[in-house]
């Protein structure tokens, strides 16, 4: 009886930590304040529910605050989403989300999670700087789009291209980026609009 009572008690402690991320509203907006100015993303949960829910969770937690735009390829994409703190990033690295079907094409201004294969999306995002329909067949599922400030996104520093090493960013965080790539633009804050 004591063992059973202990197991029930333990279950009450463990189950809340296994809870699913909060469901995002059907439509919501996120205001990004960056080193180059503001831009706003409008998210449509019905486009990609798993992606929208993860994005909502990460923005609410402040995950993207002080994140660098570490991959900026003109006429292709702007990518970010590795936390400034390697310990925080390590915690999220294994928290993948299931793929969403691609219901919207990767047109200029849409936002989607980066992926390295089936069901591998975690925290990294990109905004399409051009129409990239070839990404649709690769499983990149847009969940929202930039509704204001696309000119800000297009003006982010692109001089380093794809040079920053993502492994080093994950291991060293912003210390690596600030010392090796000081010109990178960054997110000051990302907030859900009321």
Q: Each predicted region: which residue ranges?
A:
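Bacterial N-terminal signal peptides that target proteins for export
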Residues: 1-7
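Cyclophilin-like peptidyl-prolyl cis-trans isomerases
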Residues: 15-194
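Bacterial N-terminal signal peptides
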Residues: 7-16
